[in-house]
């Protein structure tokens, strides 16, 4: 646990009692603060009381008298589409609002670091797609290379549940826009921006607000090194803003398709090969086609980001290459479930938006595509240029009929349910084809989350194998 410092003897309100909320309460208590907990759910409140915490109704008048800080969970809106009433009450009372990420950065460093031979480092990864894989890949490379490392944030443990840092340890954090938007302190040693595509726009008031939330990780006084994906305009802009000149090697540009040889430091992938260039010279090359856990151009971008981050931490190219080869990938992200009669079944349930689905559709030459769910603004119209590899689509969920209207000349069938979609795709698939779940939609119409959707797909596939 990371005890929260600087709030000794003060009352701190905690809103939202899921994993991060309860971890925050424990860390506040360990640091000497008095946490006051609240959640709209009676079950969550009862669970907190059962663990010995004080539950206080933060919706009542004058609830924030003598409260030093409100700490809120990332899923609770603080501005758009409308502030949560408890957060609005705190802001009206002049009480600062923070989250567990902000508390982590104010409390992570301790006095005993003076005795360390090598200071602990923090690497933060943000972006629209590829965050989890990139974070897990950095963590895996460090562990395989013998560096002490922990992983947390939007993946793994809550940040305040981490163990105190050891000599030379690297903490790798995946941060969503919800987390970067509200944290009052963001001071990573290395920050990674993978890419940007429309997502969570209702929470940020539009695309500009969404990008601004991500960009906070790179504010002045932020990272010593920045790894920036430049395959979208926002990444190009951010890299330019952070660089004093093209040869500035504090910014490492990465790409899954462009040659970037003219910059001070760059890592890019073309035709399945990763190349590192620094000050006009090629430093390393890796054949990514030999990495079974990293299929497709989107995973090659993730590999570039992880490679660049690990190079800033002092790892050698060959160390990184060996670790890339042993990476198994993450569940629900280009996950090979099995093969039957020459047909592969791939679970990419995490492809919840158009951009991530487009990357999945570019990874295989012949696809039986299972798509649908709770569609997002614009549906799948933007995917039309990426449907050439789709032999047929099998549409499920709330948006099945809307998606059917946007399929153009691509063959498709409305299946409604995962069960029928898997059966029909398996019946019609030919050797050499891939049955791919890449929904391009949220899961909440039929499942509690994308993980449960992916598990359902895998169970139904395994029943056929």
From Swiss-Prot:
Q: What is its EC number?
A: 6.3.2.9
The record's section on Pfam families has: Mur_ligase_C, Mur_ligase_M, MurD-like_N
Q: In which pathway does it act?
A: Cell wall biogenesis; peptidoglycan biosynthesis
Single GO MF annotation? UDP-N-acetylmuramoylalanine-D-glutamate ligase activity
Asked if the record carries the keyword Repeat, the reply is no
Location within or outside the cell? Cytoplasm
Per its record, the protein catalyses: UDP-N-acetyl-alpha-D-muramoyl-L-alanine + D-glutamate + ATP = UDP-N-acetyl-alpha-D-muramoyl-L-alanyl-D-glutamate + ADP + phosphate + H(+)
**Key word Iron present in the record?**
no
User: Which key words tag this protein in UniProt?
Assistant: ATP-binding, Cell cycle, Cell division, Cell shape, Cell wall biogenesis/degradation, Cytoplasm, Ligase, Nucleotide-binding, Peptidoglycan synthesis
What does this gene product do? Cell wall formation. Catalyzes the addition of glutamate to the nucleotide precursor UDP-N-acetylmuramoyl-L-alanine (UMA).
Report the sequence similarity comment from the record. Belongs to the MurCDEF family.
Query: What is the designated name of this protein?
Result: UDP-N-acetylmuramoylalanine--D-glutamate ligase
Q: Which organism is it from?
A: Cereibacter sphaeroides (strain ATCC 17025 / ATH 2.4.3)
Q: What is the lineage of its organism?
A: Bacteria, Pseudomonadati, Pseudomonadota, Alphaproteobacteria, Rhodobacterales
């Amino acid at each position: 646990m990371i005890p929260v410092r600087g709030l000794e003897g003060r009352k701190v309100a905690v809103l939202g009692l899921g994993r991060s909320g309860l971890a925050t309460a424990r860390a506040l208590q360990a640091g000497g603060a008095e946490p006051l907990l609240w959640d709209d759910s009676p079950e969550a409140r009862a669970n907190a009381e059962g663990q010995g915490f004080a539950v206080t109704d933060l919706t009542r008048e004058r609830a924030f008298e003598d409260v030093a800080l409100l700490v809120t969970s990332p899923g609770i809106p603080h501005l758009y589409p409308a502030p949560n009433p408890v957060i609005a009450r705190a802001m009206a009372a002049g009480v600062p609002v923070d989250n567990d990420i902000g508390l982590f950065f104010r409390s992570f460093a301790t006095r005993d670091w003076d005795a360390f031979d090598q200071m602990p480092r923090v690497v933060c990864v943000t972006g629209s797609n590829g965050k989890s894989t990139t974070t897990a890949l950095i963590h895996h490379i460090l562990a395989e290379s013998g560096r002490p490392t922990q992983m947390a944030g939007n993946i793994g443990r809550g940040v305040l549940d981490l163990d105190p840092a050891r000599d030379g340890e690297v903490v790798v954090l995946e941060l969503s826009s919800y987390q970067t938007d509200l944290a009052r302190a963001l001071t990573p040693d290395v920050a990674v921006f993978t890419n940007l595509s429309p997502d969570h726009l209702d929470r940020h008031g539009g695309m500009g607000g969404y990008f601004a939330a991500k960009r906070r990780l790179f504010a002045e006084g932020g990272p010593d090194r920045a790894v920036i994906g430049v395959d979208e305009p926002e990444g190009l802009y951010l890299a330019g803003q952070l660089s004093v000149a093209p040869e500035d090697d504090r910014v490492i540009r990465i790409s899954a398709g462009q040659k970037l040889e003219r910059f001070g430091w760059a890592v890019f992938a073309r035709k399945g090969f990763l190349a590192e260039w620094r000050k006009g010279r090629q430093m390393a090359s890796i054949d990514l086609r030999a990495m079974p856990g990293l299929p497709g151009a989107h995973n090659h971008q993730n590999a570039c980001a992880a490679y660049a981050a690990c190079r800033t931490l002092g790892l050698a190219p060959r160390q990184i290459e060996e670790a890339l080869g042993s990476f198994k990938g993450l569940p629900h992200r280009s996950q090979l479930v099995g093969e039957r009669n020459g047909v592969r079944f791939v679970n990419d349930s995490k492809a919840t938006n158009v951009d991530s689905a487009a990357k999945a559709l570019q990874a295989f030459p012949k696809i039986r595509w299972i798509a649908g769910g709770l569609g997002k603004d614009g549906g799948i119209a933007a995917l039309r240029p990426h449907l050439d590899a789709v032999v047929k689509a099998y549409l499920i969920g709330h948006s099945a009929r809307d998606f059917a209207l946007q399929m153009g000349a691509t063959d498709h069938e409305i299946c409604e349910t995962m069960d029928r979609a898997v059966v029909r795709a398996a019946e019609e698939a030919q050797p050499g084809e891939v049955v791919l779940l890449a929904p391009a939609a949220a899961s909440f119409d039929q499942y509690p989350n994308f993980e449960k959707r992916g598990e359902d797909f895998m169970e139904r596939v395994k029943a056929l194998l």
